[in-house]
Amino acid sequence: MSDNIIFMGTSKFAVPILEKISESKLNISAVYTQPPKKSSRGMRIQKTPIHVKSELLGLPIRTPNSLKNNNDEYNFIKKIKPTIVLVISYGQIIPKEFLDLSKNGFLNIHASILPKFRGAAPIQRAIMTQDIETGISFMKINENLDSGPVLKTYKIKIDLNLNATDLEKKLSQLAALKIIENIDSIISGKANFKEQDHSEATYAEKIIKQRGRYFGMRVPRKSLEK
């Protein structure tokens, strides 16, 4: 019997990774994504990029509003007994009691070189602070924000001509390229997770735009206009 996984994701960042897994020997038992929402103009219901892609791939989809105090989803995952659960740009907190439901835990791909830029907007912060490099981190989820042990990090240089959308695409493609080998190392028992240096942690808070201005960090104008 092939190893089965549960995939939790929402944004475009997670789509190439889901595609890569669907092409592998792994069995995707379920895809979790955020529920469909009304578009900004309120005229139509809009599904997430992962929802749309999962439908095209014929994958089973679940869209709970929240996992908190959700016995139905807890029991569903418990029954599946997933080999591993992947959480990539999902947009929901994973309750502590869920973390023991998978044989190999919950694996997250975070778009920074942890422990730098934990939080919601690591890609935007890397551009705002004019960093010369960034990357992705394969991390086991624990009960605290982006603070779990790290399996692997992969770095790339930040081209000054890239905007946040371009950089997100590059990091997503990198994650898709590396996802299968990292899952395989975990399933085979060869994975070597290392604790983060929490004293070096920095945070990438969500960026809020109001009346043409960005709040949360002072940055050069040219960085925001890219």
Model-derived segments and their meaning:
Residues 1-226:
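One-carbon transfer enzymes
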